[in-house]
Amino acid sequence: MVDMGALDNLIANMTYLQARDGDSRELRRQHQSLVLPGPQDCAELHRELTPDFHSLCQQQPIGRRLFRDFLATVPSYQVAADFLEEVCSWELADPGSGHGLALQALLVPVSSHPFPSPALATRCQAATTEEELAALVVLAKAEATAFLQDQPLRDFLASPFYDKSLQGKLLERQPVCDKDFTEFRLLGRGGFGEVCAVQGKNTGKMYACKKLDKKRLKKRGGEKMALLEKEVLERVSSPFIVSLACAFQTRSHFCLVMSLMAGGDLKFHIYCVGERGLSPSRVVFYAAQMACGLLHLHSLGILYRDLKPKDVLLDDGGSCRLSDLGLAVHIQDDKPITQRAGTSGYMAPEILMEKVSYSYPVDWFAMGCSIYEMVAGRTPFRDYKEQVSKEDLRQRTLKEEVSFQHGDFTNDTKDICRLLLAEKPEQRLGSREKSDNPRKHPFFKSINFPHLEAGLVEPPICAGPFGEVLPKICDGAVPIAWQEEIIETGLFEELSDPNRCTFFSSSSSSCSSASVVWFLLFFCFV
């Protein structure tokens, strides 16, 4: 007897995987239907916008690309742009025997460039030590950036390149609705709705769509929380936090379209893949990315309040991002807050105490809990599958010392957990002083953070939906069976007919999808 539930799941999986492969012909047709607004339509937008160099020319991808294209048309501007790119490459280069020589080669021609001040040009010629040269690179970088913000920016704003960026901005501002996306399989459910995979019709890119039920939000007073999450996601711009692509509403739902993280959450990897816990290299890598995400939120005055492995998602490549910012809150003028929020087992002592205010240190406490859980396969104050009341868990958090019985706890791991799980916020790593940065702890000695932020550090594992297994299973036809099939069906004779009319069609993606179907059928019905 056929399991119809499994069949539905099979069809959803098949369609989802086909969408991930993409249909280039359909995308080409969709692209041909898109038209940029005309320059004459941008007059009102031109008056409305006040261009900001950092936002327009550095943060926004289209503006950055068009500004770079414009600079390439003026040799003196191109020199400054090339210098900044060379500085960026030098900053990301591994320190070694050639690092000082590269630094010298970077600064020697600076005196002939159009952007440095006479004083800086003189100092560049006179500098001899590596320390002097490194300090001068910082100054030269600042002067090159200031140079580009002056006349080059004014010329860019008067050029057709800026008009093109306005056309892109006007296209970006067009209304978004559910008809702009194709909805695929359900990914998960939550208290206010569900998350499903969707595909943008214009680009073919896959996203996760968080659909919040309006009735549930109204009934449970969740409107402000949903709005706050949307506002927080709009502000963040970090490779370590899920990004918001757009937001729209239907008659029944508010929809947030965000990064699709197909590798599962850390909780799944800790408890459901192999033995409980993660390897030391994975623990350090994920903790480093979590620390970068928290520091970005804190730099924007945002308190996360709900860091835990379940809300840390992995992408196809194996990197992780913080997600589910529904409990995040803006801290106004560094004023602490008192409202209790978070998940039991990850909340800091100051959250659990009555009428005690708290601030950023609570996020570092939750990170300590998460590191402990990744190593030990259990939380610091509750054993695996142990049934504990919220009050007992609260008392344990307030009173008990954390023990490190698991064999994978190294001295550095124990130390960072103790510092992050310190009872008093002022003694907690990341909060002891303004310059207290958890990334400087020896636990992270193997991580090059500039490389990590630039996406140059290889993740310990690839966490795609099937990893390396699916290509090995779905590797094509078995020779004898395939040859028997085309002979028995008469296809071989038809293909061998010299008078047969033929046409070429690229169908590699459909073949790969067919293999996936049989792979899924095996697990559903065998």
Range-by-range predicted roles:
Residues F184-V195:
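Protein kinase glycine-rich loop
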Residues E194-R216:
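Glycine-rich ATP phosphate-binding loop
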Residues K211-V236:
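Conserved N-lobe beta3->alphaC-helix segment of eukaryotic protein kinase catalytic domains
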Residues Y286-A287:
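Activation segment signature within eukaryotic-like protein kinase domains
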Residues S431-W518:
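C-terminal regulatory tails of eukaryotic serine/threonine kinases
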